[in-house]
Amino acid sequence: MKLVELLSAAAVLGALACNRAESQGGLTLEAKLPMAFAQLSNVVELGDGRIAFADTKEKLFFRADLKSGKLDTLGTRVDSIARDAPASQYKFPGWVAHLGGGTVALVDFSAQRTTLWDEKGQPLRVLPIARVSGDAPVLLYDTVGYGYKIDYQAILGGGEPGRTVRPDSIPVLRIGLKAGAVDTVANLAGPEYGDAIFGDQTQEAVKVFAPNDFFGVLPNGTAWVARGRENRVDWRAPDGRWTVGKSHEYTKLPVTQQDRDRVLAQVREHGKAYGMPQNLRVEYPFAETKAPFDLALGRPNGEVWLQRPRAREEDPLTYDVFNQQGAWQREVPFPRGSALAGFGAKGAIYAMIKTGDGAKTVGRYRLK
């Protein structure tokens, strides 16, 4: 078992502005699917109001209608993908994205390819994307012809043997889907490091719960960066001009022993797949306090929602909402057991909802 595989896995585990900001918000459940799923990806709303998503544990790609409760399985899951396999086949569907022209991209984590589908659920072709900075898939797309990739290669390894690279910043690459041209559109702050120990091996690793920057893009190519150390959102217009947001004060939550135990248990569980002995000594670097947010998702209307960390794993989630001018607007508490999964038209907010037996389903909410 390679130490870097465990380190990488643990690192992963890890519109117009209102003139007056609202202090609180709430959600009303409008509809949810009657069936349950093992583990869900993000949710993408289609033009007719239906949704597309993947079950990342059962490895299936779905289209669903929240009004009727109807569920369609798209394409075919296979155990291996040939080089010339049709677009209808996938091995590990892990992420869904909306592209231009009424098309949807399905990112296959295992086959390391992205397939293009129409909104009727028909496969169109394999999307040719220039391979830059390693084999990690492109997850972010706009509707004007670009994909976006965060260049984590220097952090996760792959450089010269015996040489450790710890960059101060991590570039975000913009890749033209037609011509393959690549440029850098943003830079994220580099993460904080500490020593991780697996048995008798010691290696630098990213600190768990330390602040990280997140990148996203709106359909028209407007990009944003949520700054973890400053707790703010900066915006990049399509012409390259930047607007620096305003930092928002937050209450720092301490990293507890319970938090540490939970993360290390997840590392051990993941290590089983690589044959890691369960009695192996495992230590991991942790931050003293939790970052102001641990997830960020952009809304097509020009908002960015930042997911606050929780004092306890069972606590309900709350999101801080920033507008396109970089100002904090409001907080939105979610019902217990639900988490943000995507956005849609006419104010639709999609969430993963726990069903009580460890499974999840998809629900559509509206702001009260």
Annotate each predicted stretch with a short phrase:
Residues 18-368:
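Eukaryotic scaffold repeat domains enriched in small/polar residues
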Residues 1-7:
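Bacterial N-terminal signal peptides that target proteins for export
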Residues 7-15:
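Bacterial N-terminal signal peptides
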